[in-house]
Swiss-Prot record:
InterPro entries: G-protein_beta_WD-40_rep, RACK1-like, WD40/YVTN_repeat-like_dom_sf, WD40_repeat_CS, WD40_repeat_dom_sf, WD40_rpt. PANTHER family: RECEPTOR FOR ACTIVATED PROTEIN KINASE C RACK1. This is Small ribosomal subunit protein RACK1y. The gene is RACK1B. The keyword Repeat applies. Belongs to the WD repeat G protein beta family. Ribosomal protein RACK1 subfamily. GO terms for biological process: negative regulation of translational frameshifting; rescue of stalled ribosome; signal transduction.
Length: 336
């Protein structure tokens, strides 16, 4: 890894009226992203012509990085998560109204509603082949769906032979490894669980956190899992062996984790900053903070992270409704 690489603020995306909860970027690097928010909507952003302005005045506000051209509405409560299909045609959202929705991005319309959770949906994911959908909720269950909106399996509650989580399931992800089809989940019961996708049976229970788990992320090759939450530590797990590899101390509550698609970096959104770890040295190579400092009562912090597919751009959603866009040096950035 080039030791000199760093991230600089390239601009902002403004359009949400409440906290940004999730950001999804297409895997083919198309110039758009989709974000979800507590304003009960999703926004589709055009980033075809991002600002390349470099500020000469460090006090100047960062430039607008793109424009929202479609607002997706229909959920009756906070939209907590959003992901994209691999072809970039559809967005999938989960909401505190207890439903998932599949959206046709060409029309902005809901094409499918997924009804079955009895409490707030906190996390959603698409399988690599887009044929399966997984969701996690405050009803302590994980549900596996087909794209027709039919629930094929429920883990937890009265289902799953007592293997399910005993607290809110805050985050769920598919492993991208086709040789080991698995689902990884994190919960407020302080555990991370790995499930066999073929039969929805528990494969491994990963324990080590001292507080609730907010976020899990799986590395691009499917070999590693990172988890984080209330205790302010990120645990790195070997998914094949089912064992903890090491800890990284973030020092504050972790709300989101994501691996860089093409560098050995792990990013954590905490209540203090966005931390970028170099996993080779296991050191924080950068601490990203917003260009404005909020009053303590406002608690301005990052809630959600997503990398562009080419690894050049980090999108970070904040409690103030703004998405801040950070560029890896060499890809053009905005000096602050």
């Amino acid at each position: 890894m080039a030791g000199q690489e760093s991230l600089t603020l390239a601009g902002v995306l403004r359009g949400h009226n409440d906290m940004v909860t999730a950001i999804a970027a297409p895997i083919d690097n198309s110039p758009f992203i989709v974000s979800s928010s507590r304003d009960k909507s999703l926004l589709v952003w055009d980033i075809t012509n991002p600002s390349t302005a470099v500020a000469t005045d460090p006090e100047a506000a960062p430039p607008e990085y793109g424009v929202s051209y479609r607002r997706l509405t229909g959920h009756s409560h906070f939209v907590q998560d959003v992901v994209l299909s691999s072809d970039g045609q559809f967005a999938l959202s989960g909401s505190w109204d207890g439903e998932l929705r599949l959206w046709d991005l060409a029309t902005g319309r809901t094409t499918r509603r997924f009804v079955g959770h009895t409490k707030d949906v906190l996390s959603v994911a698409f399988s690599v082949d887009n044929r399966q959908i997984v969701s996690a909720a405050r009803d302590n269950t994980i549900k596996l769906w087909n794209t027709l909106g039919e629930c094929k399996y429920t883990i937890g509650g009265d289902h799953g032979a007592g293997e399910g989580h005993t607290g809110w399931v805050s985050c769920v992800r598919f492993s991208p490894n086709p040789m080991a089809p698995t689902i990884v989940s994190g919960s407020w019961d302080r555990s991370v669980k790995v499930w066999n996708l073929t039969n929805c049976k528990l494969r491994t229970k990963l324990e080590g956190h001292n507080g609730y788990v907010n976020a899990v992320a799986v590395s691009p090759d499917g070999s590693l899992c990172a988890s984080g939450g209330k205790d302010g530590t990120t645990l790195l797990w070997d998914l094949t062996e089912g064992k903890m590899l090491y800890k990284l101390d973030a020092g504050a509550i972790i709300h989101s984790l994501c691996f860089s698609p093409n560098r050995y970096w792990l990013c954590a959104a905490t209540e203090d900053s966005v931390k970028i770890w170099d996993l080779e040295s296991k050191l924080v190579m950068q601490d990203l903070k917003p260009e404005v400092q909020a009053f303590k009562s406002q608690m301005l912090y990052c809630t959600s992270l997503s990398w562009s597919a080419d690894g050049s751009t980090l999108f970070a959603g904040y409690t103030d409704g703004t998405i801040r866009v950070w560029k890896v040096s060499g890809f053009g950035g905005y000096a602050i």
